[in-house]
């Protein structure tokens, strides 16, 4: 199952570094391998001939090089006979466990030659064959000498997709003494399952309490309990791994209802509801949708032409998505004329076209504002630059109302008027506003929150002992429920204003929220994470993906009008790493944050091509995140 094409774990199949965590038992490298070096030794067919001539048991193991840590996907009967491990006990694990003495050992045995293990790692890193001998252990703890021939297998695109290991096992003349806590020969007595003994070892005899994998209490649970109480709490990646453990779990993980629960628990109800509104996503199915949105294997650009018109022509408008519709409000017309009209583009239509929305009580015209969508079809506009200067007013519009009407929200204690700020929404009811440009060009660094569903909404400034440098043109994204991520913008740096690539996060669920510098180029001691980060920019596009990841592209980059390269960051990682995402198709020449929105959780819509000062809003680019939406 191709679940992590970006993982760097493929190189660890044979290495087996000692770690402090208990998971090390599960991390075994190619159990064999020996002191002979690797490299381009003879043809693999010689090993096949040797296997046929061998008088002793010969193991055959195949691992998936595209999965993290190269899990085993096949072992033959010879492997089972020689090692004492059954196939269902080792599938999904890395072969490194053979370097540990017994099924409960957590570290590589000290007699295993570390130089040989290092040589195996080097061969895997270089994509070359390996031949050699290495000490391994049977399940009962007795030593084996493994003469291993390891070879990479290439796919059609010259990428290593699998590793195949042929193992000739012989008894090793090593006196290790008895295995500590070894199992008795007495048959295992069945234990009736109760909630109290679920996490306890199953007794194997009087005075014994060794866990017996053959009679795991987990499998005494019903399918319903396994799905609803255990599997549904795992991440999509974990479900994909669990499905390879045994036939029963494989069949359970084929269930679409289970996948929906997994997606909802991992991504949140709001994201799941948005995905349910996309017809193409429904046809794809939750299992495949989870895979494609996790691996981004199907991401692609395409260009569309739509009908209708947005007139008069304008720039510096704001756009957002309501279901599968794109809504455009306001903008800057000829001679800096502020606009206050509303247009809708329905992407569900067979022939999408821009349509002017007849609304009542339109807000004052503006540009440099933000437009966001709350629960359902409720739009909210904040701030911007109007005919009389900067604004700090709030208006809402129910797009699905019989007679759509803009309604002003008279919030108490509003923030100072501003433009080119950034905003995002929380819980479908709250508007978060950050930074921007105030009167006389002063940059701001404050953060405010407003619950627009309250009878008497009150603006609340989020207190923080330290704030990032003041800025405009940055992006704000929500992940992990109530965490927000700030990226880029034009930031104050002493007397200067410089484009930024800094990343800051804040958890609004904390009793005393505070800003934390995740990474960046301009913060003392911050440094950049591993990988090539995006160049500093402002007015870029930030696409929030299910699971908390953020895609960055476009905007104003030093020396360029826009940058089409996509960058991916997962702020939930222990050490967040920027990754470059290469996407097929033709990207837009220009992409700006104020004119791009995410539709249905499966695609980002970039509005308009720009020719000089003219915006062509009948030309749009679509970044599809799932294959069936193209």
UniProtKB/Swiss-Prot annotation:
Main subcellular location: nucleus
In the record, S-4a-FMN cysteine modifications are located at 95
- Does this UniProt record's set of keywords contain Nucleus? yes
Q: Which residues form the F-box domain?
A: 216-262
**Gene Ontology biological-process entries:** circadian rhythm; protein ubiquitination; response to blue light
Superkingdom, taxonomy of origin: Eukaryota
Among the Pfam families in the record, one is F-box-like
PROSITE patterns to which the protein is assigned, alphabetical: PAS
Mind listing the UniProt keywords for this protein, alphabetically? Biological rhythms, Chromophore, Flavoprotein, FMN, Kelch repeat, Nucleus, Photoreceptor protein, Receptor, Repeat, Sensory transduction, Ubl conjugation pathway
Q: Which InterPro entries match?
A: F-box-like_dom_sf, F-box_dom, Gal_Oxase/kelch_b-propeller, Kelch-typ_b-propeller, Kelch_2, PAS, PAS-like_dom_sf
- Domain PAS, by residue range, is 48-127
Chain intervals for the UniProt region annotation (Disordered): 1-36
Q: Where are the Kelch-type repeats located?
A: 378-428, 430-481, 483-535, 549-601
Role played: Component of an E3 ubiquitin ligase complex that plays a central role in blue light-dependent circadian cycles. Acts as a blue light photoreceptor, due to the presence of FMN, that mediates light-regulated protein degradation of critical clock components by targeting them to the proteasome complex.
What this protein is called in its record is: Adagio-like protein 1
Could you name the Gene Ontology cellular component terms for this entry?
Answer: cytosol; nucleus; SCF ubiquitin ligase complex
Tell me where in or outside the cell this protein is found.
Nucleus
Membrane-spanning residues:
none
Question: In what ranges is there compositional bias, type Acidic residues?
Answer: 16-28
Q: Which GO terms describe its molecular function?
A: photoreceptor activity
After translation, the protein is modified as follows: FMN binds covalently to cysteine after exposure to blue light and is reversed in the dark.
What pathway is this protein a component of? Protein modification; protein ubiquitination
Q: Which Gene3D superfamilies match?
A: 1.20.1280.50, Kelch-type beta propeller, PAS domain
